[in-house]
Structures are given as structure tokens and as C-alpha cells.
Amino acid sequence: MNIIDQVKQTLIEEIEASIRKANLAEDIPEIKIEIPKDTKNGDYSSNIAMVLTKIAKRNPREIAQAIVDHLDTSKAHVKQVDIAGPGFINFYLDNQYLTDIIPEAITKGDRFGYATQSKNTNILLEYVSANPTGDLHIGHARNAAVGDSLANILIAAGYNVTREYYINDAGNQITNLARSIEARYFEALGDTSYEMPADGYNGKDIIEIGKDLAVKHPEIKDYSDEERLKTFRQLGVDYEMEKLKKDLSDFNVHFDNWFSETSLYENGAIKNTLSKMKELGYTYEADGATWLRTSDFKDDKDRVLIKKDGNYTYFTPDTAYHYNKINRGNDILIDLMGADHHGYINRLKASLETFGVDSDRLEIQIMQMVRLMQNGEEVKMSKRTGNAITLREIMDEVGIDAARYFLTMRSPDSHFDFDLELAKEQSQDNPIYYAQYAHARICSILKQAKEQGIEVSTDADFSKINNDKAIDLLKKVAEFESTIESAAEHRAPHRLTNYIQDLAAAFHKFYNAEKVLTDDTEKTKAHVAMIEAVRITLHNALALVGVTAPESM
């Protein structure tokens, strides 16, 4: 528990004790401690007096006064208590206790803010999972940035996390990919009798694959149609996945598992899943197809598993895959999906319920659309290729750090306009530049301090820190651990980027109000230690969203 949570908990305990001493209530409702929007109303505030009105059958201001009269303020660093408005109890603290966060941050270093105990909860986080049929685009980029940041945050909060990419390598789109490669392969050999499929892939990469295979594997032309298609399927997927993995790796996005859909067919997982569903009585035959009774579990209708022609629907391997995830010992499954998958939520949850699995263990987060904006206008196509703008092009255009940060800044369930020009600006209007510049500025000050013979020390006299802006800055540092916890609990990486902006702003305000290096050696030592704690916090926070913390800019 961090020092702010400790103070809040102590306040709650003392308020509860005061209520009992004043005989206001035997069964005490939940006591909430909030941070007032206006600092004039104290450091913390509680509305418990108004909550107790019906129970105590007294005016809320009278109740508040009774609580204050019986309150022991010695344990929570309280220097003043006021009653405001209809009965709010406002607490003003002696904020010197906040300096305790300085040695803690310095001692813990790159582990500062992280949970010290495991939650003993296994989470499988699946994200990106783009079809291996072409380049990653801006929607995939947002999914990757949010997914990787969320994984980092969950791990920092004490969860056991497995990052997984589901390779869709068994569907019709892969057959179309193989037929497209086949047409380009024979075209490179001078045979134009193999036509591109109507919904084939016409990108330059497919032409290059065809040419490359024609040179390296001329023998493929003599294969049977079935064997040739199988070969092109595998080679096409391998080529696209190699390129995709390189793009993600360069984007600082990594996975523990690359799970192949084909494996579900090869190891019998799909057949076993269907048999289990049938055995449990949740499948039935109608209109020549096999259906799953998902409407028994809040889906709006039942879903087809096997079509009239004997082929599986897309839903069938997805069901087997999610059952497989549960059987691997995962307590919680989190899927990050594109906006076009919204209709999948209830059916996937229902499929797990058929196995007796609580559907609340599956969390599906829908990623809304991103618009790329330049000079106030939407940019839909690449000037270079004439196709949709790729992740690679975005990285080249604005840089990896800016791309990662901007794509994580907003709640995933909200639409987002990515301003390409702003992302490249070297000004305080650019959020990533503003945050990184704060870190670089601190590094510069620490370097100057070292040149003057002043080293970072946890033994500095922190009573020298009494500037209001310094106290505000320490409050933000002290909130880091609870911010990680909140971002993890709500699966909301943007809470961390919001925190980074607030922390950077608090530092810049302090820097503009107070000189760090002065003739007062003891005060300088205290401030140097404090800004090192801020630097560590900024570094750790930026790392959680996959962004570097430069020492100079």
C-alpha cells in the first residue's frame, strides 16, 4: 500500500472510530475519502456526515461536527479539519509525510510503482491477431500499442500475463492468398492461364512472392493442384508473418505465444470441442446445419457451427480456441478486437457458458477507429503506394515513441484522430515531447548537480522541501502505484498516459517556480533527491506504455 492509500485508510479508520465514540451509528456505511477538485477545500474530503443523516436522524452539519469533535487527528498527518457546505468534512494535511516517497522511489528504482505481491491471477491477453494476408494498418497499430501497454501495466500490478497472437491461417482468406500467389508464380514463369481469384490479393508484395518462388522453387509448377495450393498457403503465411513480426518487433510489441488456427484442426481440438458441446446437450440439427444454443446464454439467437455444406463457420474454431485458452489454466481471458467484431461478444461468452465456464472470465474490449489527420484533413491513402497507410509508414513518419504514445492516449472504446503534424512538433503542445522533455530536463539538472559535487542521496534533509509546487509534485509521484493499479483494474492504459502528462506538468510548474541548484547546500540536496524520484517515476511510467525516456533532447 502506497503512502497516499495509507493516509486514506487511516482517515477512514479514525472517522469510523469517531462515529462510534459519538454514538452516531452501529452499522457504519462505507466511508469514502475523495480528493477535492479545488485545493482550497483541503487535501481530502468526506461526505460521510450526509450519508449518516437518515441513520443518525440529525442534521448533516451537526453529524459532521460530532465526528470532528471526537476525531483523533494525530495518526493521519492532519493539521486542520473544516466543515463546509451541507456537511462535507475537509482535511488539511501536514504534507511533509509525502517526502517519504523520495527514498522509496530512489531505493526501488525501475521497480518503483510496481506491486510487491503477486495477485496469483493468470491472464491471457490476445491482441492484434491480424490476418497474415498483408501489411498492418492504423487499426492494428492502435490494437498493438494498447495491447502491449496493457500487458505491461497488468504485470506491474502483479498479474501473471501471457501475451498471445492468434494466427488466422486456416480460413478462406488464406486460400485466396494461396491462389493469388499461384497466379503471380505462374505469371513470373510466363504462364498467364492462372487467373487471380475475384477476391484475391493484388498487392506488390504478392507479385514479389510469386517472382521469388518462381526463381527458388520452379519445381512447384509440377505439383498436383492440391499439393501446390497447400505449399502456397504455407509459404504465403510464412512470408506475411515474417514481415508482420518484424514490424511489431520494431514497434516494441512482443508476444509470448503465436497460436496457429491450423493447429486446432491438426490436433483435433475443434472436433473434441464439438463433441463436448453435443455431449452437454447444447447442439442441435436444423435446416441441414449444426447449431449451438447460444440464445440460452444471453445471445440474441443461436449460432451455426457446421454449415449445410459440411464446412465450419468462423465461429467454430473461435469457440475451440477460447475453450483451449481456459484449459491452459488461465483465470481471465482478455481479447482486444476491432470495431467490426462487436457482434462477437455475446456469442463467444455464450460458447464458454455451454462448458460451465463463467462468461465473466472473458473480457472483450472493442477498439474503435482511428483517423489519421494531416493539416486538418483526413489522410486515407499512402502517397507512396496508393494503399492504406501501414504501421511501418506511421513509424517512419512520426517515430516509434510518438506513435506508441499517441495511440495509447485515448480510451480504446472512443474514436481517435491521430494528428501526424502534432506528433512531430517539438513543442509543449505535443504530449510525448512534453513528457520526454521533462525527463531530459531532470537529467540535465542532475548532471549539473553532479558536476558541483552533489550526488543523489536518500539521507538529505527533506524538511527543506516546503514549496507548494514541490508538494504538488510529490503528490503526483505518490499517486503512481495507485494509478498503475487503477489502469490495470479498468484495463485502461490511457489512465497512465494521462498521469504522465499530469506528472510532467507538475514538474515543469515546480521548475518554473523554484530553482533546484542554489547556494543552500542542504536544500539543493533535498531537491536533487526529489527530482531523481520524479525522474524514476517518469521513466517507469513511460516504459509501461512502450516509450523511451531520453536523457537529452
Curated annotation (Swiss-Prot):
One of its GO terms (molecular function) is arginine-tRNA ligase activity. It is found in: Cytoplasm. InterPro entries: aa-tRNA-synth_I_CS, Arg-tRNA-ligase, Arg-tRNA-synth_N, Arg-tRNA-synth_N_sf, ArgRS_core, DALR_anticod-bd, Rossmann-like_a/b/a_fold, tRNAsynth_Ia_anticodon-bd. Keywords: Aminoacyl-tRNA synthetase, ATP-binding, Cytoplasm, Ligase, Nucleotide-binding, Protein biosynthesis. Its EC number is 6.1.1.19. Its main location: cytoplasm. A motif ('HIGH' region) lies at residues 130-140. This is Arginine--tRNA ligase. It comes from Staphylococcus epidermidis (strain ATCC 12228 / FDA PCI 1200).
